[in-house]
Amino acid sequence: MTSPKHIDEFIRPRHNELPNELWTETLPNLWQGGTLDVWGNEDWFEQANIIGKEITKKDFDCVYTFYASAEPADWFVKELRFGFYDSALTDFDPVENLLDIVKMAHKDWKSGKKVLIRCQAGLNRSGIVMALVLIRDGYEPADAIKLMRDKRSSWVLCNKNFERYLLNLTDEQLAIWRN
């Protein structure tokens, strides 16, 4: 497992690599993604071949949505919604607000359900929650971030506040997410 010596060495410059698909499989049955209204960019939708794509039971068993204005999943798809801002964590406590959600998403995924964790662009809010699910599964924070960037986009967790939160977790904080 990777463990950066200095956090600033890990926070690298971003590239012009937006995701080329609405949803990306990070690990078997565990997906990260966005919504159809990402930036209102129809050109991106055409490139990604996702115009008119809705979430149905054929796609996912469970959807965890972290963008309050997202279109809901279709009938018979279990969906949990908790909107929060893609910004600083000054008025938001991840443990208080996300721990139960992360436990539920992890439990659904480990029970064999196909799980989507999504926000608007599929980069930051979904990124912090996906990283916490991976941490719960035993990943180190840096390894979880690298996996998401390798699978989805180098822009995952371009919100440095979210990235720093994950990379600065103490052993005691990691234990909270893992138990």
Feature map (PLM): residue ranges:
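A phosphate-binding catalytic loop at a beta-strand-loop-alpha-helix junction
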Residues: 112-131, 135
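Short, basic/low-complexity N-terminal boundary segments at the transition from targeting/disordered tails
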Residues: 1-10
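Short intrinsically disordered terminal tails
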Residues: 1, 178-179
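Cysteine-based protein phosphatase catalytic domain of the PTP/DSP
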Residues: 11-115, 135-168, 173-177
